[in-house]
Design a protein with these regions (language model features):
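Short, flexible loop/turn elements at secondary-structure junctions
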Residues: 18, 22-24, 129, 203, ...
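Acidic/polar loop-and-plug regions of large Gram-negative outer-membrane beta-barrel proteins
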Residues: 232-236, 246-255, 259-287
């Protein structure tokens, strides 16, 4: 009996301690809930896609607009023909010395039919030659006149994009090869200031320098200009042969209103290159 009398106060003390601890914890939870601030509402708005023109720079390496298939500024996904576009941004990554080098990774296009020479942009599209009498090379939608080894050549540094349209195109472009055509788009003046100077050196004693400047001539952007130039010298694959290319392309744009613009796109590209079609090598020694 004595043990039970002495144990009873201990149980009472434990019960009191549990009740007090529960009350204190409840007060702390209530206090935390009371001081917790309200969550702010965050609204996320997607940025609009950058505007792109079929005759201007692409927002990314993959172009979304083209004028080759319809001769109008049309989304590529809405053009029924098969079109591949190599943009200036992609060319800057690969650093091609010719347009055919820029098209090396384009499906359905063979570029190595004339060896290592960069003098001509000879292409084979879907098994059909794009040079010769058909001359399927175009600049800004206009055919570059030429015949076999008398073809007009454009340096890729002068271009905003190079586009390949595969398949028959005589409905839009007249007489042409059934394999397809190459359409090159020149760099055009911009209303935002742009300045670029490059120096490049490489194998075969390659040395190249170029510049690309563009800006608006007035505050309203009515008149703008662009001046692109290039000078390159390198040894050819054959010993004793040398390639020299100089190019300059001044451009001027007049925008009388928001829906009208006139752009002048002259260019000059003199080139000096050794003959790679036939080379006789003198042999020394007794016969």
């Amino acid at each position: 009996m004595a043990r039970s009398k002495t144990a009873q106060p201990k149980h009472s003390l434990r019960k009191i301690a549990v009740v007090v601890a529960t009350a204190v914890s409840g007060m702390s939870v209530y206090a935390q809930a009371a001081v917790e601030p309200k969550e702010d509402t965050i609204t996320v708005t997607a940025a609009p896609a950058p505007q792109e023109s079929a005759w201007g720079p692409a927002a990314t390496i993959a172009a979304r607009q083209s004028a080759t298939g319809t001769k109008t500024d049309t989304p590529i996904q809405k053009v029924p023909q098969s079109i591949s576009v190599v943009t200036a941004e992609e060319m800057a990554l690969h650093q091609p010395k010719s347009v055919k080098e820029a098209l090396s990774y384009t499906p359905g296009v063979s570029v190595g039919t004339r060896g290592a020479s960069n003098t001509y942009d000879h292409l084979i599209i879907r098994g059909f030659a794009a040079e010769g009498q058909s001359q399927n090379n175009y600049l800004n939608g206009l055919k570059l006149q030429g015949n076999f080894y008398n073809d007009a050549v454009i340096d890729p540094y002068m271009l905003e994009r190079a586009e390949i349209m595969r398949g028959p195109v005589s409905v839009l472009y007249g007489k042409s090869s059934p394999g397809g055509l190459l359409n090159m788009v020149s760099k055009r003046p911009t209303t935002e200031p742009m300045k670029e100077v490059q120096f490049k050196a490489g194998t075969d004693s390659l040395f190249q320098t170029g510049f690309d400047f563009s800006d608006s001539l007035d505050d309203d952007g009515v008149y703008s200009y662009r001046l692109t130039g290039l000078a390159r010298s390198a040894n050819a694959q054959q010993k004793g042969s040398e390639e020299q290319r100089y190019a300059i392309a001044p451009a001027f744009t007049w925008r009388p209103d928001d829906k009208t613009n006139f752009t002048f796109l002259p260019f000059l590209l003199p080139e000096r290159a050794g003959n790679r079609l036939l080379r006789l090598v003198a042999e020394r020694g007794n016969r």
